[in-house]
């Protein structure tokens, strides 16, 4: 079908939010309404790297074709490193390639935005509208059961799930039924996933909203591999977008095409790209735009500011050789891969139907733990967290394998503790360096530039390390991926114990347990059993580690050297008063209806609109913003009542999966 040059509505960016907006609006009861969805990446339909949940780590590789990697300025807070922040580059955005973890924000998160229509109570009907909750539920008033996005445990659970939960419970972290109830901030749970259990497939935004609509409607036009250069503004009104090929034929003289919008343009390019599009369009800090050769149209200093993320780090551990993990599969073992693919294609179950992240916690410190923090952090905690008991400080979860480059570690079986800071105090920015859409931005994510972010990450390392050491599967620490404690420190990371090492090696191995004291020290045996030092299934425990100030310094150094993005960035087009607010001090970009200040018919809708952080994996928030934005656009067009349902056609088994789909 030929793509016309003019539409009623143009949605620029086919990520998690953009797909939701375009899919909903194309289902308005108006056969003459046309919607264009413009996406820089490729179409994701029938892509096994998308729909198979268990292959998601491949999308994190630096040579991935499904992500764009942005490099930051060098940072003193990261010991001189540059942060690398990937952004999805495929239809469906992050929902096509993320970790698939189902997590929802705390109620106070949305309330704190203080924007009309955006409180948790007001958003709850839209949050429920998103999902089909595919598990028994005691909170039916908080979940949805007929939405386009499916939520389940997948069709396979690694045994590290119950092992982790027993260990966490022994630390005083209660195991709860529903940690995503908007209020529980301290607990452990069997973690749900954005996976359709009926199909064994990832539940991404494009397959949920866009592809079903395009199979049933003629009103939605999809334009892929196309980058937005700028919005064209005439007499204060957004009237068109100028686009260029995603891959430049001639970067110095880009070939462009302009698409006009009769009613509305919605920018949904993500936290890094949305402010860059606005800046190239003449919307941003006027002095900066002039300095890079762009004529200012609207002076909005907040564009590109207030960059936030969740700060993540990983710590791996050995597990006993009989513990199932995904290591052999991701390492490329042909037997493991054939078995997993055969099981998925035959039954839609097995290890390819999970992300291997089976259990996790949200935690807040006790008064005793908080007393060990520095004074600056305690003041910040008192101001931000004390009166908001629904906000967790940290998250960590167990991954059933080594999450990282397997060429850098020996063969074996592992588990990885995956941590992220829920509400960092640090802030950053992203700015264009020229009017050329292919030029890299000036980017400083601000990771750890506020030292108050260090104590909770040190605390989480200690907490998760004790969880790991209390797990029955625990067999030692991958010392190369832990802090560099002093040799004589009791906190020093230790390798496989002797018995486990021998079990891995087998009877014919000649060098297993060869003593090489300058390189490795085995883990101690667990302490003798006593009533106060066992988990609920009577597993003996290793003694708790006591840390010195010197040990804490080693952990801080490790965190500075290894903290990275969690792919959860937000905030650069903040929905806040134009003059700014406490949570968006450099100025707001959007009003409560997502309109860009000073321009008619132009909205922004993606995670960049969040003026403050959310304590969750952000796919749920991106979808919530999408549902809200679709409603706002429809209301602007004059729709109300049941017309705002904009029901998506059902995703039916076999609709997208072609017979004989080639395996990897």
From Swiss-Prot:
Binding site for FAD: 8-39
UniProt entry keywords in alphabetical sequence: FAD, Flavoprotein, Methanol utilization, Oxidoreductase, Peroxisome
Recorded superkingdom: Eukaryota
Active-site residues (renumbered): 568 (proton acceptor)
Induction: Induced by methanol. Subject to strong carbon catabolite repression.
One biological process term in Gene Ontology: methanol metabolic process
Pathway: Energy metabolism; methane degradation
Residue runs in coiled coils: none
GO (cellular component) term, any one: peroxisomal matrix
Cofactor annotation comment: May possess two different forms of flavin adenine dinucleotide, classical FAD and so-called modified FAD (mFAD), a stereochemical FAD analog, in which the C2 carbon of the ribityl chain has changed from the R to the S configuration. Conversion of FAD into mFAD was observed both in purified preparations of the enzyme and in cells grown in batch and continuous culture. The relative amount of mFAD in the enzyme varied from 5 to 95%, depending on the growth or storage conditions.
Subcellular location: Peroxisome matrix
GO molecular function, one term: alcohol oxidase activity
Catalytic activity annotation: a primary alcohol + O2 = an aldehyde + H2O2
EC numbers: 1.1.3.13
Entry note about domains: The C-terminal peroxisomal targeting signal (PTS) is essential for the efficient targeting and import of AOX into peroxisomes via the PTS1 pathway.
PANTHER family from the UniProt entry: GLUCOSE-METHANOL-CHOLINE GMC OXIDOREDUCTASE, GLUCOSE-METHANOL-CHOLINE OXIDOREDUCTASE N-TERMINAL DOMAIN-CONTAINING PROTEIN
Protein name: Alcohol oxidase
Organism: Pichia angusta
Lineage: Eukaryota, Fungi, Dikarya, Ascomycota, Saccharomycotina
Gene name per UniProt: MOX
């Amino acid at each position: 079908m030929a793509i016309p040059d003019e539409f009623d509505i143009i949605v620029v960016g086919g990520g998690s939010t953009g797909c939701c907006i375009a899919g909903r609006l194309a289902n308005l009861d108006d056969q003459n309404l046309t919607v264009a969805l413009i996406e820089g990446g490729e179409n994701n339909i029938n892509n096994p790297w998308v729909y198979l949940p268990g292959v998601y780590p491949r999308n994190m590789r630096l040579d991935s074709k499904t992500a764009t990697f942005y490099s930051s300025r060098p940072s003193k807070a990261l010991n001189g490193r540059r942060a690398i922040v990937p952004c999805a580059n495929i239809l469906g955005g992050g929902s096509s390639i993320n970790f698939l973890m189902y997590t929802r924000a705390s109620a106070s998160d949305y309330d704190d935005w203080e924007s009309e229509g955006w409180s948790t109570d007001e958003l709850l009907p839209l949050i429920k509208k998103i999902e089909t909750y595919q598990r028994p539920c005691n909170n039916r008033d908080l979940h949805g059961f007929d939405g386009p996005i499916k939520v389940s445990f997948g069709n396979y659970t690694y045994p590290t799930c119950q092992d982790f939960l027993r260990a966490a419970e022994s630390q005083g972290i209660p195991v709860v039924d529903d940690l995503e109830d908007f209020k529980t901030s301290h607990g452990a749970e069997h973690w749900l996933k954005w996976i359709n259990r009926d199909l064994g497939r990832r539940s991404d935004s494009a397959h949920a909203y866009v592809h079903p609509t395009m199979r049933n409607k003629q009103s939605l036009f999809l334009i892929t591999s196309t980058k937005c250069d700028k919005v064209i503004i005439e007499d204060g009104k957004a009237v068109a977008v100028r686009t260029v090929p995603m891959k430049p034929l001639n970067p110095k003289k880009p070939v462009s095409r302009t698409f006009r919008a009769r009613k509305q343009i919605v920018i949904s390019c993500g936290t890094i790209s949305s402010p860059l599009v606005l800046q190239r369009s003449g919307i941003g800090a006027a002095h900066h735009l002039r300095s890079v050769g762009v004529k200012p149209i609207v002076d909005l200093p907040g564009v590109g500011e207030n960059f936030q993320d969740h700060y993540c780090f990983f710590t791996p551990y050995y597990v006993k050789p009989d513990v199932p993990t995904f290591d052999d599969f991701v390492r490329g073992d042909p037997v493991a891969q054939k078995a997993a693919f055969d099981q998925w294609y035959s039954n839609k179950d097995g290890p390819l139907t999970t992300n291997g992240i089976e259990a996790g916690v949200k935690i807040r410190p006790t008064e005793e733990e908080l007393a060990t923090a520095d004074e600056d952090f305690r003041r910040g905690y008192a101001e931000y967290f004390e009166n908001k008991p629904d906000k967790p400080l940290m998250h960590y979860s167990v991954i059933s394998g080594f999450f990282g480059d397997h060429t850098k570690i020996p063969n074996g079986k592992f588990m990885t503790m995956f941590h992220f800071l829920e509400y960092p105090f640090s802030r950053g920015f992203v700015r264009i360096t020229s009017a050329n859409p292919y030029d890299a931005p000036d980017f400083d994510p601000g990771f750890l530039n506020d030292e108050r972010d260090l104590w909770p990450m040190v605390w989480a390392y200690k907490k998760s390390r004790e969880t790991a050491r209390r797990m029955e599967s625990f067999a030692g620490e991958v010392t190369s991926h832990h802090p560099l404690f002093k040799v004589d420190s009791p906190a020093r990371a230790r390798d496989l114990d002797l018995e486990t090492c021998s079990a891995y090696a087998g009877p014919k191995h000649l060098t297993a347990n060869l003593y090489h004291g300058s390189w490795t020290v085995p883990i101690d045996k667990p302490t003798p059993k006593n009533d106060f030092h066992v988990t609920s299934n009577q597993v003996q425990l290793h003694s708790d580690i006591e840390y010195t100030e010197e040990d804490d310094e080693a952990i801080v150094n490790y965190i500075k050297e290894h903290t990275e993005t969690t792919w959860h960035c937000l905030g650069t087009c903040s929905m806040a008063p134009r003059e700014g607010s406490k949570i968006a001090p450099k100025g707001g970009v959007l009003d409560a209806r997502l309109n860009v200040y000073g321009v008619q018919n132009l909205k922004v809708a993606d995670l960049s609109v969040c003026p403050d952080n959310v304590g969750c994996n952000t796919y749920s928030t991106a979808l919530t913003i999408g549902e809200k934005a679709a409603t706002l656009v429809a209301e602007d067009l004059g729709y109300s009542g049941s017309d705002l349902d904009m029901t998506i056609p059902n995703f039916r088994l076999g609709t997208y999966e072609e017979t004989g789909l080639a395996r990897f």
